[in-house]
Curated annotation (Swiss-Prot):
Domain of life: Bacteria
Record key words, sorted: Ribonucleoprotein, Ribosomal protein, RNA-binding, rRNA-binding
Annotated S5 DRBM domain residues: 14-77
PANTHER family listed in its UniProt record: MITOCHONDRIAL RIBOSOMAL PROTEIN S5 (PTHR48277:SF1)
InterPro entries, per the entry: Ribosomal_Su5_D2-typ_SF, Ribosomal_uS5, Ribosomal_uS5_bac-type, Ribosomal_uS5_C, Ribosomal_uS5_N, Ribosomal_uS5_N_CS, Ribsml_uS5_D2-typ_fold_subgr
Name under which the protein is recorded: Small ribosomal subunit protein uS5
GO CC annotation terms, alphabetical: small ribosomal subunit
Length: 168
């Protein structure tokens, strides 16, 4: 009973979005084995976001596994108001994602998988450009890499042993 209540609370805390579902086959002696691979992004629209992949013989089971994996793989995104603190270039494999802060009210200028990650992270104003590979998993991983590179002015000042006013 307590386990069930915890799951209900967890479900309301995070929003999830299925980025892609891929049918994969394995050729065996007796023919082909079909399975489904799901890529899911979860976030609380308040600075926390994660992604996960799941594989199963049925689509709902693959999605459930991907959601579980995503909740174990959360990162915190530093934000300045509704946008990012500075530019970042995320790279994973052949995929590169350029993330740029935008003025308030500009919205999320991003496509597909990048939009899912940024919206669920709670970033409301950002411009992005996808370069290289457009495979959904590479794009999501590159976006998360770019978000991991972000630092607030206070963090940079502390690392350099200066005050924030020295940078202005």
């Amino acid at each position: 009973m307590a386990e069930n209540r915890r799951n209900d609370r967890e479900q309301s805390e995070f929003e999830e979005r299925v980025v892609s579902i891929n049918r994969v086959t394995k050729v065996v002696k007796g023919g082909r084995r079909l399975r489904f691979a799901a890529l899911v992004v979860v976030g609380d629209r308040n600075g926390r976001v994660g992604f996960g992949t799941g594989k199963a013989q049925e689509v709902p089971e693959a999605i459930r596994k991907a959601i579980e994996a995503a909740k174990k793989n959360l990162i915190t995104v530093p934000m300045v108001g509704t946008t990012l603190p500075h530019e970042a270039l995320g790279v994973f494999g052949g995929g590169k994602i350029l993330l740029k802060p935008a003025v308030e009210g500009a919205g999320v200028a991003a496509g597909g998988a990048v939009r899912a990650v940024l919206e669920l992270a709670g970033v409301a104003d950002v411009t992005s450009k996808s370069l290289g590979s457009n495979t959904p998993i590479n794009v999501v991983r590159a976006t998360v890499d770019g978000l991991n590179q972000l630092k607030r002015a206070e963090e940079v000042a502390a690392l350099r042993g200066k005050s924030v006013s020295d940078f202005a």
